[in-house]
Amino acid sequence: TPIKSSAASDVYKRQVLCSSILNGRFDGFYSSYPITILLITTASFCLIYLLNKIWNGVDLRRYFWLLVLTCVGHQLLSIAMFFFPVVNDVVFSIIQQSALEERANELTILNRFHTVGIAYFGAGALYSYCILLIVILSQHNYKFIKGWVIPIILVFLFAVGSAVSRTTMMGLIVALVYLGLIILRSKGSQRIIKLVKYVFCGAFALLLTFTLFNKYITDNFLLESIIEHAFEGICNLFNDGKFTTSSSEKMFDAYIWPDNLWTWLIGDAKLKGVDEFSYYMFTDIGWCRLIFDFGLIGTIAFIFMQWKLLKVVFVQKINYLVVFVLFLSFQFKGISELIVYFMPAAMLWLFKEPYKK
C-alpha cells in the first residue's frame, strides 16, 4: 500500500535533514527536498482523485497510458518549438527559464530538440521509462487503443526522444532485454508473438525512416544536425566499431569520489557548486552526487524508497525488477527518481485495487 512507500520516504527525509544538521549547511534545493516529496505526494493524490472522477474509475494501465501519451504530446511540442521559432517564443513567454536552463538551451538550440526545462538527461530518463512501460502494457488488449498503434508510439518515442536525449537508448535496451525474458517465460504465447511482430515492425519503420532522411533530406541542415546528434552512437558503431558519443567520453572524467570517511557516511549536504551553472565537486554523475549529498546512508535510503514505491505499484516481480534495474542504470550518468512518475500509480491503491500487472 502507499503507507509502506510513505514509511520508506520518511526514512529518506530524516537522513536528508540529519545530514544538513550535522554539517551545519542548508543548501536551498537539498534541505527543502523533504517538502518537495510531500508536494509530489499531495499532487499525485489530487491527480488520481480527479482522474477517478473524470473516468468514473481509474486503473494502473490507463494511468500509464496517460503518462505515455503525455510524453508523446511533449515530444510534439519539442518538434514544433524547434522548427517554428514563434512557438518557442510563446512557450518561454509563459514559462520562465532559469539561468542554467536558458544557457543550456542556447548552447544546443541547433542540434537537439528541447522544451520546458533543460530536458536532456531528465527527459531521456522519462522517455526510457515510457518505452519500457509500452512493452509491459502491450501484453494486454485495450478498447481505447489499437494494437497497430503501439509500435508507432514506440518508434516515435525512441526517435524523437533520442533527438532530445541520447539517454533514451537505455530504455530501449532494457525494454528489449525485458521482452526477451517475457518470450522465454511465455513459451510461444500468441500475445507475445504478436508483441514481437510489433517490435520488429517498429524497428523496420525506424530503419526505413532513418534511410529516407539520410537519402532525401540530408541537404536540410537542421534535420541533418538533429539526426547526427540523436544517432551519434549508432553511427560511430558502424564507422569505428565502438558505440561512443562525445558526452559518454567526457562522462568518465566526472567520476569524482569523497576523500574522507565523514563524507562517505553522511555526505556534505550540498548539491550546487560555486555558481548556478555547476554542481558540487563539479560532478553530475548520479552515484557521486548522491554520496556527496547525503553519504552512503542517505544513498541507501534513497534507493530503498524507490524500491518500495515500485513494489507498491507492480504486482508481478519481473515488472518492478526491470524498472528498478533501469533506474539503477541511470545513476551511472545522472540522478534519476521514480517518485514523480510512479507515485500517482501508487495512489491508485487508495481508490481501488489496480489491474494486476
Residue ranges and their predicted role:
Residues 6-222, 278-357:
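Hydrophobic transmembrane helix bundles of membrane-integrated enzymes that assemble
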Residues 92, 225-294:
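Long extracytoplasmic/lumenal interhelical loops at the membrane interface
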